[in-house]
Curated annotation (Swiss-Prot):
Annotated family: Belongs to the Amer family.
The protein's role, per its UniProt record: Negative regulator of the canonical Wnt signaling pathway involved in neuroectodermal patterning. Acts by specifically binding phosphatidylinositol 4,5-bisphosphate (PtdIns(4,5)P2), translocating to the cell membrane and interacting with key regulators of the canonical Wnt signaling pathway, such as components of the beta-catenin destruction complex.
Membrane topology: Peripheral membrane protein
GO-annotated molecular function: phosphatidylinositol-4,5-bisphosphate binding
Residue ranges with Low complexity bias: 142-158, 255-269, 343-354, 446-457
Record's protein name: APC membrane recruitment protein 2
Primary residence: membrane
Stretch list, region Disordered: 1-23, 74-360, 443-560
GO BP of this protein: ectoderm development; negative regulation of canonical Wnt signaling pathway; Wnt signaling pathway
Compositionally biased region (Gly residues): 1-21
The organism's taxonomic lineage, starting at the top: Eukaryota, Metazoa, Chordata, Craniata, Vertebrata
Description of how the protein assembles with itself and partners: Interacts with APC.
Amino acid sequence: METGRSRGGGAAVSERGGGARAGVCGRQEQAGALAADMDSHCECAAETPAAEPPSGKINKAAFKLFKKRKSGGTMPSIFGVKNKGDGKSSGPTGMVRSRTHDGLAEVLVLEGSKKEEPPGGSDHSGARPIPGPPKPSGPGLGSLASSSVAKSHSFFSLLKKNGRSETGKGDHAEASKAGGKQKRGLKGIFSSMRWHRRDKRGKEEEEKAVRAAGPGNLVLPGSLTASLECVKEEPPRAARRPDSPGQDASRHAAGEPAGGEQAPASAESAPERICLEAGSPTGSGDQSSRGEDAEGHRREEKPGAALESGAGEVQAAEDASKTGDVPIKTVPLVDSEGGSGRASAVPDPSSVDPPSDPSADRICLMFSDVTSLKSFDSLTGCGDIIADPEEEAGPSCDKHVPGPGKPVLSKKNASVVAYQGGGEEMASPDQVDDTYLPEFWDMLSQTEDQGQGTQEGAAKAATASDIKLAPETSSDTRCGEAAKDMSSVKRRRLHRIPIESQQKEEPKHPEKEHQEGVPNSDEGYWDSTTPGPEEESISNSSSSKKVVIPRDSDSGDALCDLYVEPEASPATLPATEDPPCLSRLKPVSPGTITCPLRTPGSLLKDSKIPISIKHLSNLPSSHPVVHQQPARSEVPRTKIPVSKVLVRRVSNRGLAGTTIRAAACHDSAKKL
């Protein structure tokens, strides 16, 4: 029935086509004439399918191709609007609706053929043999495969030719197509979409190779193909996420460069790939092989643009699919991770090394701060207190240990400048206590034994041991020897200090008056980190006074006697060897050490020890200074916070002899 109607309608159409085509020959490009021809076909086809009227409207704008293609899709109402707009706006180019680049090529070729066909009225007879293929395709349209064929490029061209020839065969194809449309449901639509893409691969990919770059693919397909692309692109995306990156690369490289249709083609296989993946763990390999096969077919079908635009990409995709891009992508990931790992690995050794270096650096800075304060009238009042008496005695100790002492002085002169004021706290002996007190006490025990055997052997150990064995007498003799040895250097620094020492000695008479103001003066010096030279000299005198009083109270009368004896000599002979001895004797007393060390506030922490042993606590904290230099040379990396406990032990040990020994050691350290 439908075929008879379509044939009858085809006869009527042919009759109309006789006159209409004659008039249309001149104005084929105009959408009105085409709409008239399409209306005739629409009437014939609209008799059977209820969905034909919207498709008929589309056909007016799209040369029946939209109608048939629309009939191929059971969603004419939805996409019909898009097709209507596209077809009407595009007119004869409405055929461009095909999402693929082939659609563009087909539009150009078909339009050219249209122009050629209508002028020759004999084209109808010539076109009739052409629709012969549509007949087999027509029954095929009834099935899902037929719908895909209808959407195929060749069938589109045949449909266009049939529509133009308006032969009964073309109408019959339309009728059969309409019947197929009615049979198809949503399942048929989706299946036709998938099949259409698969079939189109071979047919349209040839023209796609020519039209490799077609940004309007998605725009053109406003029909089911567009929706199919959208629908299928989404599942492939989901599939791409679980799929190996190799598959993604193969899809992008092989599918996209060739054209938008290849990607959908791969998208069609994507759902199957997903199923395969879910079914078997080797689904990824199967997918990659399929991608390769599809790509292989695509390559064969795409001799031109595929080789030009995506040959390298396709090869890369094949390699990716064969080798699996998982390792490839993972390789950059591994590289990035490896780089980060390398970076992390690098910081690890660097973090390990710097602590060791900073420990030595901190030691150097600590020595430099102490020595710089000693050798230089540091801007800090405390530094001034330490500096003047120790500058005199410092050179002798420096000569005994010129290697570590002098370079430290040179290094830390600059550092002292940076650490003026609070810098002293930075290099306070607390840090030294944390790191070197254990070693220092060990060194003290060793140096006592060694000092007895070799007082002059190991410079630092000898000086410390001599002072420890006989804090009073050895300090005098030691000062004399050091003064003789370093008379020249002493004189140089003595020239710097004689005036200051005299000033110190002069105000020493009213020492008792300054005794009460000692702590306040220390605080004042600490607060004013940069006193003027006059202030420095005054502070030196006051500091010497301060030193004298604690010596009397803490270290005993012997130290006071020693200290009182030098008072006369330095005033008389500042540049002679005696003043250095006196100055050295001064630092020997713990008072000199305690005053400057108290000010930094680091020793305040050590002041936890009972007041009677404050000097001991201060001295052990300063003792590490003595052995810090040798520690730098011997064991620069010693991080032992237990040193504070050792300081407490020292306080428990607290004996007058030990205090004097510690004072002597600290003096030697300051000299260094």
